[in-house]
Amino acid sequence: HAFPGRPRIWLKYDGHNQKTVLTRQAKKEGVRILNRHPVLDLIVLDGEIAGALALDLSNAEPRFTVIRARKVILTTGSANRLYPAAGSPGAPFNTAWCPACAGAGQAQGWRIGAKMVNMEMPYRHAGPKFFSRAGKSTWIGVYRYPDGRLLGPFVERATRSVGDITCDIWNSAYSDVILNGSGPAYIDCTQSSPEDLGFMREGMHSEGLTALVNYMDESGLDPSRHAVEFMQYEPFIIGRGLEIDIDGQTSVPGLYAAGDMVGNFRADLSGWPGYGGIAGGTAARSAAN
């Protein structure tokens, strides 16, 4: 995600065990975790948040559960499956993002009157064609036309330090070259060193792309010898949603939000730890008072 010669501000994140780590830390802090209790709606009393309505699915017969709370923090992620899967329209769960993230938090906030921003501007990511797994910047290679020409002017050979930023600048490139007949576009890793390819493979494991790694192993797809066709995936909602203030609070008093469902702050990994901590700390101090 960096131009050659400019500061590289993005870090690799080893998130393969993040759920285990976060759950362990939450339990250490004394957090009570309600599994199999998806929240259906938020509860407002006299214009302020008062709790949430959940559906208890822990038994054979579901039942509603009312959870009273002085403060509520929404961190339900992005909104996927609003559009058919670009690579496989008949398989909606073949999506680059978590198919369980369906915009529940954005909808719940909207239903109680929380201010929303940027919802009309969905985002499109990219990755291997048909096998929907995002993380194009994890690939250490350059983008090429079918005849071998470089797609962009930035680098002729990619390394783990400087990748090909072409499709960050020209984010519709994969679709454009199909539409104008010059495509498709391929990621070419054949010039990358064995050390960089090993680093790339490790990065894929860290970023949840293990299914892609397994598929390449099973099918004999070797990035050191084979180019991989890329495509632009279907639109989804990330970094669009509830508007928050500097403390992470929405326009509904007592309701906070962080992460992919926030509409006026950076989403993704850069956003949720920072504003998750800010919202959590602010909500806790406010509730204590």
What spans do the regions from the language model cover?
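Short hydrophobic core segments
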Residues: 65-77, 109, 256
